Amino acid sequence: MPQVTMRQMLEAGVHFGHQTRYRHPKMSPNIFGARGKIHIINLEKTVPLFNDAMNFLSAVAQKRGSVLFVGTKRSARDAIKEEAERCGMPYMIQRWLGGTLTNFRTVKQSVARLKELELAETDGTFSKLVKHEVLRLRRESGKLQASLGGIKDMNRIPDAIFVIDIGHEDIAIKEAKKLGIPVVAVVDTNYDPSLVDYPIPGNDDAIRAVQLYARAAADAVLEGKAAMPNAVAVREEEFASAPDAGKKGRQAQPKKGKRASDAAAE
C-alpha cells in the first residue's frame, strides 16, 4: 500500500476544508476545528480512512479489476489524466456524460465511432476525401476524443470509481450507486461522506492535495497489479512437469503384444 504520511498531507493542504457556514452535519466527526472562517479537517481521522480506500483500490487491481478515475473540475484534470495513464486505468476529465455507466452500451457505440475515425486518419482514408469533409470528420473526432478519449479502452463497466469532488461529480456517483459500483472519493467539509463507500475526508480544491490523492490511487493500483497471481508462470511450471509425468505413465504400460504378467517378469 502506498505510504502517505500526515506530514505530506499537511504540506499538500489536505487539512483545509470549506468555509464554516457550508459545513455538512455528517462531516462534523472529521473536523478538528476552525481557523478564521475555514474548517480544519482532522487528519488523524483522514489517515486511516485514506489507507482503507487505498487498500481497496489495490485489492480491485489485484483481482484484475478496473478503476475509473473521475476528475472533471479544472484543478483535478491534469493530475487525474496523468496518474490514470501511469497505472493503465480509464479516466474521465471532461464533463461527465449522463449515462456513461448506466447506458454503457450506447457509450460504446460512440467509442467505436471514435476508433473508426482514428483509423481512417491513419490508414489513408482521409487522403481520398475532399478537404471540407476531412475537416468535418476531424472536428467530430476531436469532440469524441475530448469527451471519451479516456475511456475508449474501457470495454466493460468498471469495478470501482475514484472521485475527487463528490459534489462536482454527483451524476457519476449516482450512476455508480445505481449499478452497485463501489465509490472511493475525496469528501470535503461541505458534503455528506455517507454518499460513498470509501470516503477520504480532505481538501478537494487544492492542486497539490489532488495530486497527492491521484498519485496515491495510481500507486495503489500498480501495487495491486504487481501482486496479481501469475497465471502464466503457473502454466509454464505445469507444462515443464508434464513430460516427466507422461514418461512415468509410459513406463507403467506393458509392451505391446505381451501379457501384463510377462511384462512384470521381465
UniProtKB/Swiss-Prot annotation:
SUPFAM superfamilies: Ribosomal protein S2 (SSF52313). Keywords: Ribonucleoprotein, Ribosomal protein. Pfam families: Ribosomal_S2. GO terms for molecular function: structural constituent of ribosome. InterPro entries: Ribosomal_uS2 (IPR001865), Ribosomal_uS2_bac/mit/plastid (IPR005706), Ribosomal_uS2_CS (IPR018130), Ribosomal_uS2_flav_dom_sf (IPR023591). GO terms for cellular component: cytosolic small ribosomal subunit. Residues 248-258 have a biased composition (Basic residues). Residues 238-266 are annotated as: Disordered. GO terms for biological process: translation. It comes from the Bacteria. The keyword Ribonucleoprotein applies. Belongs to the universal ribosomal protein uS2 family. This is Small ribosomal subunit protein uS2. The lineage of its organism: Bacteria, Pseudomonadati, Pseudomonadota, Gammaproteobacteria, Lysobacterales. The gene is rpsB.
